[in-house]
């Protein structure tokens, strides 16, 4: 999915792929030690992971390890991730635009622009674009560290088992087909 449909039609230009993800440290980053600062709508780096994009805004080392902040652009009717849970992090998803569907434990919920969904650690969850227009969410991950999962996934190094062990996650990959059928979603393979 080229640059998540050019950053969901905003014609986003920056690209970060396997070949240049190691240049992340040279990218302009937020640094709390530099004092107050604005992170603009085109700052950060967008990584195209197939079904969902990741725009890195605040890294853990920039927040003293307290949190990381990423933006996920999700194309219409796409599942963002298999059913999964984290053993270390809580996640907060703030819907910027569109309609996000989420399975939180046993509950299916829907969040519109301006809504915040809380996904506590150890709870099975997944999320998707539940609409026919682009969806964008800001994801606050606390404590920080899990943003490195996206970085490594984009580099294409390691196996799913390795990632899950390293980042303290579990994923139910068999849930993908069921979730797509139940909610009319697509989930292209990550390349």
What is the predicted function of each stretch?
Residues 17, 23-56:
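Extreme N-terminal tail/first-helix region
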Residues 43-83, 89-90:
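A short glycine-rich, His/Asp/Glu-containing loop-to-beta-strand
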Residues 2-6, 14-16:
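Intrinsically disordered, low-complexity segments enriched in serine/proline and basic residues
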Residues 65, 121-147:
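Ligand-binding loop in jelly-roll beta-barrel domains
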Residues 71-75, 85-104, 140-141:
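Short, conserved beta-strand element in jelly-roll/cupin
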Residues 53, 92, 99-101, 108, ...:
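Structural motif
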Residues 106-124:
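Short acidic-glycine-tyrosine-enriched beta hairpin
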Residues 152-191:
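Acidic/histidine-enriched, glycine/proline-rich intrinsically disordered or flexible terminal extensions
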């Amino acid at each position: 999915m080229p640059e998540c449909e050019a950053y969901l039609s905003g014609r986003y230009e920056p690209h970060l792929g396997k070949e240049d993800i190691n240049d992340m440290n040279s990218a302009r980053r937020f640094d709390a030690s530099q004092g107050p600062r604005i992170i603009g709508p085109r700052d950060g780096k967008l990584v195209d992971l197939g079904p969902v994009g990741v725009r890195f805004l605040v890294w853990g080392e920039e927040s003293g390890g307290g949190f990381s902040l990423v933006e996920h652009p999700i194309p219409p009717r796409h599942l963002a991730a298999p059913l999964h849970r984290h053993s270390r992090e809580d996640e907060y998803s703030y819907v910027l635009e569109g309609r996000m569907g989420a399975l939180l434990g046993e509950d299916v919920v829907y969040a519109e622009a301006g809504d915040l969904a809380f996904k506590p650690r150890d709870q099975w969850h997944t999320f998707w674009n539940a609409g026919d227009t682009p969806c964008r969410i800001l994801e606050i991950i606390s404590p920080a560290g899990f943003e490195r999962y996206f970085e490594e996934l984009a580099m294409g190094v390691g196996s799913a088992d390795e990632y899950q062990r390293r980042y303290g996650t579990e994923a139910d990959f068999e849930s993908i087909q069921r979730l797509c059928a139940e909610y009319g979603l697509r989930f292209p393979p990550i390349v």
